């Protein structure tokens, strides 16, 4: 009888293999990289969380910051494994109480992200986590919000990177380390 552990050792799939591509969603010409299939598979989800953790082994991290919405799923799991707190950064109007806001550019227009004004303390070291790095606008807004509260961003971790959209260059240009588990060409 084969044990689950034995089965896992022989499975050669990568994180990328668990991500499905949906053509023409949400608009014609878009290849949507869907991580829900990764999250739904226990082995795939564990693999992604373990690889995100490995990238920051040895870093002193006080909190994990997750970007709405799939960053909450990943960030919560990473925070749990690190035994640190989790802080959500949400779209405008979704957090109760006192918040600070940061506008950022979208392809057509602007959006606003918010964080509770007491979510981070000066000097805390935080890891920002999200599922996807495209243009980097959302992550840059997250970096700004963390910085305005006095926290130090030790890195930005993503499952997927879409390299041709320039997000890595933006975040590295702001002086932040970027780690992505896989990259897909043809956004």
UniProtKB/Swiss-Prot annotation:
A Gene Ontology biological process term: adenine salvage
What is a single cellular component term in the Gene Ontology annotation?
Answer: cytoplasm
Q: Where in the cell is it found?
A: Cytoplasm
Gene3D superfamilies named among the record's database cross-references: 3.40.50.2020
Q: Which UniProt keywords apply?
A: Cytoplasm, Glycosyltransferase, Purine salvage, Transferase
Q: In which pathway does it act?
A: Purine metabolism; AMP biosynthesis via salvage pathway; AMP from adenine: step 1/1
The keyword Amino-acid biosynthesis is assigned to this record:
no
Molecular function (GO) terms for this protein are: adenine phosphoribosyltransferase activity
Q: Say which enzyme class the record assigns.
A: transferase
What does the subunit comment say?
A: Homodimer.
Q: What is this protein called?
A: Adenine phosphoribosyltransferase
Q: Which organism is it from?
A: Paracoccus denitrificans (strain Pd 1222)
| Lineage of the organism | Bacteria, Pseudomonadati, Pseudomonadota, Alphaproteobacteria, Rhodobacterales
